[in-house]
A protein has these predicted regions:
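Membrane-proximal juxtamembrane linkers immediately C-terminal to transmembrane helices
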Residues: 64, 256-276, 298, 348, ...
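Alpha-helix N-cap/start motif
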Residues: 40, 124, 137, 213, ...
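Alpha-helical transmembrane segments of integral membrane proteins
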Residues: 77-87, 115-142, 146, 150-153, ...
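Small-residue-rich transmembrane alpha-helices
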Residues: 70, 74, 148-213, 256, ...
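Generic structural signal for small/hydrophobic residues in well-ordered secondary structure
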Residues: 43, 71-77, 111-115, 129, ...
C-alpha cells in the first residue's frame, strides 16, 4: 500500500451525533462482478429490503421510494451513464438517428413500390412475351426481385459516398464524432441490400408476374392495375406523407420546446448575472474566500455578491429528511446559502422575509446547535408538501421534531437543475460565513465584458493559484439543453429528407399519371375545359391522399410528442398551430411538385393529345 496520509477516527463521535451517523453521499458508483445475469437480478431484487434494514428508520415507512440502489449493466453504461447532466442524452441521440434512418428508408421503399407498380403497364407486354416463350411465374418473380436488389445495391454504393460526405454535417448537428466503419460496413450493407431490396421488390414482383399473357397480348391498351392499383398507390402515398408530416410536426414541437426551456422563468433574471464556479475549488479556503468576496463587492458596477452550495447548472444537492408527526418522513433538498445570495438571484418573495445580518438567529453555521432549532426559507413546492395551505400560513411555523426548523420566509422558485425534473421541495439555510464549496454569484449592471475583466483581474491578484472560471447562467444551464437541441437538429434534417424523398416519388407518380391521361385531357379541352380546369383536376387528384395523410400524421405525432413532453417539468402546450403549420408546409411543397406536371399537361393542344399514343 502506498498511503499519503492517515487520519485517526475518534472513538467518541462529535457533539452533532446525528450528522456523524446519518450523513451520507450517493454520488458514487460501485462496480460489482456477478457469475451470471441471474445472480445480478437476484442481487438487485434484495436491494429494497437492504435499504429498509439499514436505513428504514431514517427514511420513513417506504424507504425504497426515497433511496434506490439500481444496478446498471456495464454494456449500457455508454448510452446511460449513471448521474450527471448527460443521463439519457446519448440514448436520445442514438434513438433519434435510428428513427430518422428507419422512417426515411421506409419512405424511400414506398417510393420504389409506387413507381414500380405505376410502370407495370409498360412492362406487361414484356411479361406476356416471356410467359409465351416458356418463363414461369417463379422465374419472373426472381427477375423482378433481382432488379430491385440490384437497384438497392447501386443506391447503397451512392449512400456510402453521401454518408462520407455528410458525416461532418451530421456530427456538427448532433454533437457527435461518428466515423464510417469500413471494417463493419460490407456485411451490414449486404444485409441491408438484401432486406431492403426484398421489401421494395416483393409487391411489384408479385403484381408484374401475375399478368395473364393472352389478355395482355390481345388488348390494345396496356394494363395499369385498374382502380385497385390506383387505390393501392394512393394508400402508399398516404403512408408516405403521413410519416413525412409527422416528422415535420415532431421537429416543430422539438424546436418550440427547446426555445421554451431556454426562455422559461427559472425564478431569477439571467441578464446581469455572473456565476463563479472557481470558488468551489477544493484549494479555496474560507480565509481566502472572504477577502475575495469583499473585494468583488467594491468593484464598480457590482450590485451584490453572494454564494451558495449550488448554482445554475447544478443538478445535485444535499438531501435532508424532515420527520413530521403522523406522516412519513419528507425528503427535501437542502441548500446552504451565504450573505446576499437571495439579493443576487432576487427570487420572488411570497411571504415573510429572507436571511439578513440584522437577525442573528438566522446563522446556522454551527451545526452543533441545529438540535435546538434553526431558521429556514422554503420554496413554493414545500408549502403543500409540509401540509400548509398558503405561504402566509407557513411563515413562523416550526417543522421537524429531532431537528426543528422555523420557516421565516417563502420564495416562489429557484430552478437550477434540468428542465426535465419538477421543482424540488427545497429548504434554504443560512451561513453567515462562506458556505463550504460555495458557488459564487455576482449581480451587476453595465458591460458584461468590463465586469468580467475587472473580476478576472481581482481574482488573479488574490487567488492566482486557482484557475479563473466565470460563466453566465445560460452557459451553466446549456448542458441540460444539449441533447434536445441535437435531437431537434437531427429531426429537422430527417424531416427535410423525408419530405424531399416523398416529393420525388410524388413527382414521378404525377408524371406517370398525366402521361396516361393525355387523351382524357385532350377530350376535356375539346369539350370546353380550360387549362385552369385541367390544373385543378390534376392537383386535386394528388392532393386528396396528402390531405388524408394528416389523419395518420396528427394522432401519431400527438401521441409521440405528448409522451416526450411529459418528461419535462415545464413544457409547451401542443398547440394546433404546430399541426396546421407543418401540414400547410407539406401541402404547399407537394402542390409545387405537382404543379409542374399539371401545367405541362394543361398546355397540350387537343389535336396533339388526341393523336397521342
Amino acid at each position: 500500500l502506498h498511503i499519503s496520509i492517515l487520519i485517526p477516527v475518534p472513538r467518541r463521535p462529535p457533539p452533532a451525533q446525528w450528522a456523524w451517523y446519518k450523513w451520507g453521499m450517493v454520488d458514487v458508483a460501485t462496480f460489482l462482478r456477478f457469475p451470471d445475469d441471474q445472480s445480478a437480478k437476484a442481487f438487485a431484487a434484495k436491494m429494497p429490503a437492504f435499504i429498509r434494514r439499514h436505513a428504514g428508520q431514517d427514511l420513513g415507512p417506504e424507504p425504497a421510494k426515497v433511496l434506490s440502489l439500481p444496478l446498471l449493466p456495464i454494456r449500457q453504461a455508454h448510452l446511460q451513464p449513471p448521474g450527471g447532466a448527460e443521463v439519457g442524452a446519448r440514448a436520445l441521440t442514438v434513438v433519434t438517428l435510428g428513427l430518422v434512418g428507419i422512417l426515411t428508408l421506409l419512405i424511400a421503399i414506398i417510393n420504389y413500390v409506387n413507381l414500380a407498380t405505376a410502370q407495370a403497364g409498360r412492362r406487361a407486354r414484356e411479361v406476356a412475351m416471356r410467359k409465351v416463350l416458356g418463363a414461369h411465374r417463379a422465374m419472373l418473380i426472381r427477375q423482378f426481385m433481382g432488379e430491385a436488389v440490384s437497384m438497392v445495391a447501386v443506391a447503397a454504393l451512392i449512400g456510402m459516398i453521401l454518408t462520407e460526405v455528410s458525416l461532418p454535417m451530421i456530427n456538427a448537428a448532433g454533437g457527435l464524432s461518428l466515423t464510417f466503419p469500413y471494417v463493419l460496413a460490407p456485411p451490414i450493407l449486404v444485409a441491408l441490400v438484401v432486406i431492403v431490396g426484398g421489401l421494395a421488390g416483393f409487391y411489384p414482383a408479385i403484381l408484374l408476374s401475375r399478368f395473364p399473357a393472352a389478355a395482355v397480348l390481345a388488348s390494345a391498351r396496356a394494363p395499369g392495375g385498374g382502380r385497385a392499383g390506383t387505390r393501392s398507390r394512393e394508400i402508399l402515398v398516404v403512408i408516405q406523407f403521413g410519416v413525412a408530416i409527422a416528422f415535420m410536426i415532431a421537429t416543430t414541437v422539438l424546436i418550440a420546446q427547446t426555445i421554451h426551456v431556454r426562455r422559461s422563468d427559472l425564478g431569477f433574471r439571467r441578464e446581469g448575472l455572473m456565476i463563479l464556479p472557481s470558488m468551489a475549488d477544493k484549494r479555496m479556503f474560507p480565509d481566502q474566500t472572504r477577502p475575495i468576496l469583499a473585494a468583488l463587492r467594491r468593484l464598480p458596477g457590482v450590485v451584490s455578491v453572494g454564494s451558495g452550495s449550488a448554482g445554475p447548472g447544478d443538478g445535485d444537492s444535499n438531501l435532508d429528511v424532515i420527520d413530521l408527526p403522523g406522516r412519513p418522513g419528507l425528503t427535501v433538498s437542502n441548500m446552504i446559502v451565504g450573505p446576499d445570495f437571495f439579493r443576487s438571484y432576487a427570487p420572488k418573495l411570497l411571504a415573510g422575509r429572507v436571511f439578513d445580518e440584522a437577525h442573528g438567529g438566522d446563522d446556522a453555521s454551527d451545526w452543533t446547535k441545529w438540535k435546538d432549532g434553526r431558521n429556514v426559507v422554503i420554496n413554493r413546492p414545500a408549502i403543500s408538501a409540509l401540509g400548509f395551505r398558503s405561504p402566509a400560513e407557513a411563515v413562523g411555523k416550526t417543522v421537524g421534531r429531532t431537528n426543528p426548523r422555523t420557516i421565516i420566509g417563502v420564495i416562489d422558485r429557484l430552478r437550477f437543475s434540468s428542465p426535465r425534473t419538477p421543482d424540488a421541495v427545497t429548504l434554504y439555510q443560512y451561513n453567515r460565513d462562506v458556505p463550504p464549496s460555495a458557488i459564487g454569484v455576482i449581480r451587476y449592471t453595465g458591460s458584461p465584458l468590463d465586469i468580467r475583466n475587472a473580476v478576472h483581474a481581482t481574482w488573479l491578484r488574490m487567488a492566482p493559484q486557482i484557475p479563473f472560471v466565470a460563466l453566465t447562467a445560460d452557459q451553466r444551464l446549456a448542458q441540460y439543453y444539449k441533447a434536445d437541441d441535437q435531437a431537434a437538429r437531427l429531426f429537422g434534417i430527417g424531416a427535410a429528407m423525408a419530405l424531399l424523398i416523398a416529393c420525388f416519388g410524388l413527382w414521378g407518380l404525377a408524371s406517370f399519371n398525366t402521361a396516361r391521361r393525355v387523351k382524357e385531357i385532350g377530350i376535356r379541352k375539346t369539350l370546353g375545359a380550360s387549362s385552369a380546369d385541367i390544373v385543378r383536376l390534376l392537383v386535386h387528384q394528388f392532393l386528396r391522399p396528402i390531405l388524408i395523410a394528416n389523419l395518420l400524421a396528427w394522432p401519431l405525432a400527438y401521441g409521440a410528442m405528448r409522451t416526450w413532453l411529459a418528461g419535462f417539468g415545464d413544457a409547451v402546450t401542443l398547440s394546433p398551430l404546430y399541426f396546421i403549420g407543418a401540414s400547410g408546409v407539406a401541402i404547399f411543397i407537394a402542390v409545387l411538385t405537382i404543379l409542374s406536371q399539371a401545367l405541362r399537361a394543361s398546355r397540350a393542344t387537343p389535336a396533339w393529345a388526341l393523336r397521342h399514343d
